[in-house]
């Protein structure tokens, strides 16, 4: 996004007059007038390509192909210590001016699982499975993002209300077992013989008390005590293996009355804007794919990206029409600059949401670990006429590259240094935020997590621009709540002008600097 200021030659409406050409397939130099190799121009907008806002749903029937992601907690974690990024952003001071009350933030992601610490969660629809409401998170990603934006604090004193949570779904690729027929035979008749009680012993009159048992033997060696539950119990670990957990306190044979309900243990975690409402829209999932094999002419991976671009465009329009004044898109798509697919609908959608509906759209810069997300050049001092290196772009990230309407966020560490091997640079990066030391709400229970299940019974530490975008979305919500009279354009302008700038003033890794909620 270009830096907004007095005298700028760019405005949000300046690109909306003509139909896009750059968004049509750019494969193999097919676009007339496009410089050779990887050189591209900023995208243009065709408002007439706006997709309709119908009931959310996938473009084709889908099915679950993989098991849902499990989550965990890293050894030695102390959630009573505030995450480093919260200290870096000085949120306690920022909250003196408000906590985002009254602002709706749409999270277009993998869905958000209900949690007691997300009390204002609104179902926004599902573009992965027909009939869904957006409140299922198989990938354990959208819930993390939403909680970093909006999780309420827990002081441990007041019990949080329980919330319904759907069971974790399983893949539908396995053949169901054949039906079984069970034949029930009648129970054969039984003969019961009643034996009369023996007569009383001689010398004992009828009705006299029966002699008691003999006294116990004298004290001596005692037999082993009865096992009341001590020992060990086998429980599943995060990746489906087994581990042994010791049980130190055996069950009490005489339990007392239950203790009054208590809240969760106090911790230092909170979302950036705990007063906001979250609209959850599930637009993507790595665990789901087409129900029927793809039979078109395009490469299946290209066809999948085309569908993802279309559903993302529809999700943005739907979020804007639901009243979201901030739209967070952490799950972005990368593609080669030599093969940019048609994005007219997506361009029209971000223009509609930002200009017509006055929503602040925040998107991640993209992570190098994702498919097709190869790093872009940072800056070429030999090209002073191209300070943001548009002519050197090798990877396009969408919708992030619609820089006139989308605030794109790069990732830094807790010291403010760019995550250069992870965060995808680009001329559209406008701001940055911490992307490490991630803590969030669990999509599987009422607790906190800071890890996800990895291979070979390992835990993976989440990090990257997805969570940097969540932080900036939270800060944007704080500013919207404090200054409701400001437009989305003015909110973005304020955020990039108050960011902590890099040495050059702006660069393709961190944009105009690290977001500052109290500036």
Task: State the predicted function of each range.
Residues 110-114, 127-129, 154-155, 284-288, ...:
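Solvent-exposed loop/turn segments at secondary-structure junctions
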Residues 109, 385-477:
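Extracellular S/T/G-rich loop segment that most often corresponds to the catalytic His/Ser-adjacent loop
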Residues 1-41:
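Secretory targeting and sorting signals
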Residues 204, 287-398, 458-463, 467:
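Substrate-binding/access-modulating region of protease and related hydrolase catalytic domains
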Residues 38-50:
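Cleaved targeting-peptide boundary
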Residues 101-105, 274-279, 321-327, 355-361, ...:
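Loop/turn elements at helix/coil->beta-strand transitions in domains of secreted/extracellular proteins
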Residues 483-519:
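C-terminal subdomain of the subtilisin-like protease fold in secreted/lumenal serine endopeptidases
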Residues 44-46, 54-83, 88-280, 284-306, ...:
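Active-site core segment of subtilase-fold serine proteases
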